[in-house]
Structure formats: C-alpha cells, structure tokens
C-alpha cells in the first residue's frame, strides 16, 4: 500500500536576522575574492539591535572596508530606519578578525603539509540531494517556501504592498502519496509589517499578492489552509526582535529537511572550506545522477579529513529507485568527478565573487548562471558509462 504523509519545509527572507548575518558574511567574502582569489576567509556575523559583530579568520592581501560592506548589505536588505528596527547607516560595527591558523593553512595550501596536494580545510561530512519531483530536481516543499519569501521581497520592493517590512518567514506543507506530491496542505507566511495596518489587510494582501501567484496549478488545493501572521501581529522584527547569527539556517539553505545535512554551514566561507564546496559538489553529483535517469531520488555523502585531498568516503543512496546497483553508481562517481578540494573548485569554478547571491532563497535549485553546481552536464556521461544495464 502506498504511504500517504505530509512533509513541511520553511524558508526565511533576507530581512530575517539569521539571513542578514549570512548576507553580510557572504558580501564580505565576495568583496575579498574580487581582489584576492587566493584568500582564506571564514567570516561570522552577529546582528542585534543597533549592532553588528564581525568575527573570524581572514588571510588576504585585499584591503577591504569591512564596516562599509556590512552597512551597504544591511541597507540593500531594507533596514534603513530605526523606526523599522535597524538602520545600516547608524549601527555600530565591531570587528574581531584574525588570520587563519598556520596549523590549518599548512594542510590546505598546495605543496605544504603531509599531503602535498591541496587538502581539505577541515574534517567533516557533507550531503547532496536531488529528486525528480520538480523541474529543478529539488523537493517541492522547500522550493515553494523559497518562492514565497522571494515573492514577499519583490512585492515589498516594488511598493505593491507598502506596509511590508523586510523580515519574513514561510512554511509549506505538502501531501504525498509515496514519492509523489499530490496536494498542498498548509501555507504559513509570517511577514513584518507597519504598525498602523490592520490584520485583515495583511491577511488579504498576503494571500492575494504573495501566496496565490506562486501556488502550482498541478496540485490539489482543496482544503488548503492559509496561516498569515498567526500570532496576530508582527511589527517588531529583524535584529530588534531576535539575535541573528551566520550559519543558523542550514536546513533552509539546503533541502528543507528532505535528505540529510552534515552540520557545516556555508556562508562566509571561501571554497577551500569543504563545508561549502563539497556540499555544492555533492549536490552536483546527486543532481546529475537523477538527471541521467539512473535514479529517481539520490543522496550523496562525502567525507573529508583535514589536510587530506581525496575524500575518505563516498556514499550514494537512491532509496530503492536506482536502475543499476548503487555500488556501480559510486564507482561511476569516482571515475567521472574530481572530488578533491582543488578539483571541486576547478570543476565548479568556485573562486569567484558569487556568494552573496546564495545567501537568500537557498543554495540549491537555482537557475542563475553562477550556480554551476546546478548544471546537469555530466548526466549523459553517467548514462553512457553505466552501459546497457541502465537502459
């Protein structure tokens, strides 16, 4: 009997305090990479009422005004007035930045350390995931959740709903039959708003201008619930309402709870950090496996040891949907993809100032050209090398 269940995923917009922190960290990374592609960057951000703290390790010859980068990012997000909880022009910016530890750098720099190749910047495990339930080979709940937060930002910036403020969260619950999404169950959207607007106006505006334009037409919406600002009020938002930290929305950044996560955050880290680059590579591998038709669902785990170039393990799980043995797919992955840090960086062209754009609306399932890990250019190679057994 086919199992029926409801699965939920959430997204948060750039005005959410944790996403503000991610945006600032990645904006600083981009500013450095524009001048120094060999930089080592691990930049963490904390935001709270009237204050930004930048802390971490940065080794670079780039001369960057970190304070101004933080301010510009905050203003771009929309926090430009103390009346809405934060003003990027007036907030304090505290710097606590040092250089990367030499004990770490000797294992990362090519030609140094026990493994003379460029080694992983840390130990750890990373997961990539793909499934065939959407055109982007992403799980539907997280894709719709991102569409909602992105739509809120568009409506706010155009002035279509003039009472919207930057902080926003969405959550989408989808009903499944087996592996197939069949119906929308519940949509939650909580958006910061001006104090004077009524909740009736907020509810009507959100449903008509934000939610309905992004609902897919191929799913059953009979009995769908819309929960708009379910507390009844959302005036205090952003850092005035909650402290924000880089890396605290790693499930929003990835697959919305579908598939697993190794625990390492992405934002503020240059691509020598496998927390980021290997997670992108794992998505690239998983997506190409599904795009090739070798499996309907695929999860890839990569694991690394600090200072060692090659992954210590590579695992493919297709949840019973593969057309050939999973062990054979693992062998194909090792044959066709260079999963050493240097190989990943070259394969995906990661030494570029592309990271601020990843900090909101997810790192995966995006169609912008800089998201090279979303290409399916190795699908034909996988299918060809799989041989007649995959036909």
Curated annotation (Swiss-Prot):
Location(s) in or outside the cell: Cytoplasm
SUPFAM superfamilies: S-adenosylmethionine synthetase
Pfam family of the protein (one): S-AdoMet_synt_N
Region (Flexible loop): 100-110
One Gene Ontology MF term: magnesium ion binding
Gene Ontology terms: biological process: one-carbon metabolic process; S-adenosylmethionine biosynthetic process
Catalyzed chemical reaction(s): L-methionine + ATP + H2O = S-adenosyl-L-methionine + phosphate + diphosphate
Required cofactor names: Mg(2+); K(+)
Cofactor binding note of this UniProt entry: Binds 2 divalent ions per subunit. Binds 1 potassium ion per subunit.
Residues bound to K(+): 44
EC number: 2.5.1.6
InterPro entries the record matches: ADOMET_SYNTHASE_CS, S-AdoMet_synt_C, S-AdoMet_synt_central, S-AdoMet_synt_N, S-AdoMet_synthetase, S-AdoMet_synthetase_sfam
Signal peptide: none
Residues holding Mg(2+): 18
Sites where the protein binds ATP: 16, 167-169, 233-234, 242, 248-249, 265, 269
Enzyme class at the top of the EC tree: transferase
Pathway connected to this protein: Amino-acid biosynthesis; S-adenosyl-L-methionine biosynthesis; S-adenosyl-L-methionine from L-methionine: step 1/1
Any one annotated GO CC term: cytoplasm
Binding site for L-methionine: 57, 100, 242, 273
Keyword Transferase: yes
Keywords for the protein's UniProt record, in alphabetical order: ATP-binding, Cytoplasm, Magnesium, Metal-binding, Nucleotide-binding, One-carbon metabolism, Potassium, Transferase
NCBIfam families: metK
Similarity field: Belongs to the AdoMet synthase family.
Function, as annotated: Catalyzes the formation of S-adenosylmethionine (AdoMet) from methionine and ATP. The overall synthetic reaction is composed of two sequential steps, AdoMet formation and the subsequent tripolyphosphate hydrolysis which occurs prior to release of AdoMet from the enzyme.
Subunit structure: Homotetramer; dimer of dimers.
Protein name: S-adenosylmethionine synthase
Biological source species: Mesorhizobium japonicum (strain LMG 29417 / CECT 9101 / MAFF 303099)
Species lineage: Bacteria, Pseudomonadati, Pseudomonadota, Alphaproteobacteria, Hyphomicrobiales
